[in-house]
């Protein structure tokens, strides 16, 4: 199927409306799992972005050494310290037992140090069994996990290097070739893929969408973590990984453009987080 570029009208449909009489928790509960001794900021970016995307509650699971800094970053995050400094099987099992009732979506991998890949499988399988919609990024993008997420309404968000590690194939340089490869692999593995790049390619194997919103300043570290948080926040309310990923890519790009307009080539990922309310407000709908 031919790929097509998304626009504002698509995003307006993909971002769910909110009931005027809704209560806390009914607009999405998100779990963010990430971080390490070196990369403490990644899950913070994702968590703040998820909150700014419009969900109600964000639970942020980080290594216990990172917990104080994560709590200090925002009083809005509910921080869950992991039992170990890296994701071990024991830490994964304990976290699975702490998952709050009614969790809608989870994003895993941003800056995450994984001691053993079987630990990732333990956590992912537990979440899938609870009907939690899952988005995987960065450290969680390993081939061993593909069998566990196939046909489970899951999203992966690799850049080109992570894409090769995950699928064993390098995406072509031309957009037509990239779109064709992403669509084929999404269909083959029963997942939704968001291949990040100057033009993002999003496919669930049936539909393939493109996003060209963004700015040169977005090469700064952390913008991919922001994208993961937005995707998880929307996925908590929209059960379609394709629509959630496409909307997130577009909105992330809009925030990057707005940040560059304000700060030139001197932005940070937190600038994108702070601009999310203004770029998302036009897509707000109340029922």
Curated annotation (Swiss-Prot):
Cofactor(s) this protein requires: Mg(2+)
Record key words, sorted: ATP-binding, Lyase, NAD, NADP, Nucleotide-binding
PROSITE patterns: YJEF_C_3
Coiled coil: none
UniProt signal peptide: none
Pfam families to which the protein is assigned, alphabetical: Carb_kinase
GO biological process: metabolite repair; nicotinamide nucleotide metabolic process
Catalytic EC class: lyase
Chain sites annotated for binding AMP: 196-200, 224
Positions of transmembrane segments: none
Catalytic activity as recorded in UniProt: (6S)-NADHX + ADP = AMP + phosphate + NADH + H(+); (6S)-NADPHX + ADP = AMP + phosphate + NADPH + H(+)
The YjeF C-terminal domain, residue ranges: 7-283
Protein residues bound to (6S)-NADPHX: 42, 159, 225
An example Gene Ontology molecular-function term: ADP-dependent NAD(P)H-hydrate dehydratase activity
Listed EC numbers: 4.2.1.136
Matches recorded under NCBIfam families: yjeF_cterm
Description of how the protein assembles with itself and partners: Homotetramer.
Described function: Catalyzes the dehydration of the S-form of NAD(P)HX at the expense of ADP, which is converted to AMP. Together with NAD(P)HX epimerase, which catalyzes the epimerization of the S- and R-forms, the enzyme allows the repair of both epimers of NAD(P)HX, a damaged form of NAD(P)H that is a result of enzymatic or heat-dependent hydration.
Annotated family: Belongs to the NnrD/CARKD family.
Protein name per its UniProtKB record: ADP-dependent (S)-NAD(P)H-hydrate dehydratase
């Amino acid at each position: 199927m031919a790929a097509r570029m998304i626009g504002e009208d698509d995003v307006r449909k993909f971002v769910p409306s909110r009931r005027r009489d809704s209560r806390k928790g009914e607009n999405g509960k998100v779990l963010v799992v990430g971080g390490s001794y070196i990369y403490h900021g990644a899950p913070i970016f994702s968590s703040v972005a998820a909150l700014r995307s419009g969900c109600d509650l964000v639970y942020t699971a980080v290594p216990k050494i990172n917990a104080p800094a994560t709590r200090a970053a925002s009083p809005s995050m509910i921080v869950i310290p992991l039992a170990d400094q890296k994701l071990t099987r024991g830490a994964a099992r304990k976290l699975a037992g702490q998952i709050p009732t009614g969790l809608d979506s989870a994003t895993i991998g941003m800056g995450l140090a994984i001691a053993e890949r079987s630990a990732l499988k333990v956590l992912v399988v537990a979440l899938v069994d609870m009907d939690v919609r899952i988005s995987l990024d960065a450290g969680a993008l390993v081939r061993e996990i593909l069998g566990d997420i196939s046909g489970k309404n899951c999203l992966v968000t690799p850049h080109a290097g992570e894409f090769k590690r995950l699928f064993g194939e390098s995406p072509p340089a031309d957009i037509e070739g990239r779109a064709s490869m992403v669509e084929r692999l999404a269909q083959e593995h029963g997942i939704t893929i968001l291949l990040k790049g100057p033009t993002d390619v999003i496919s669930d194997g049936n539909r393939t969408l493109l996003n060209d919103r963004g700015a040169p300043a977005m090469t700064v570290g952390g913008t991919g973590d922001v994208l993961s948080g937005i995707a998880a926040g929307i996925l908590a309310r929209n059960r379609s990984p394709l629509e959630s990923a496409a909307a997130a890519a577009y909105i992330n790009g809009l925030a990057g453009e707005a940040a560059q307009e304000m700060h030139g080539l001197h932005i940070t990922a937190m600038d994108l987080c702070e601009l999310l309310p203004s770029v998302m407000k036009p897509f707000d709908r109340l029922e």
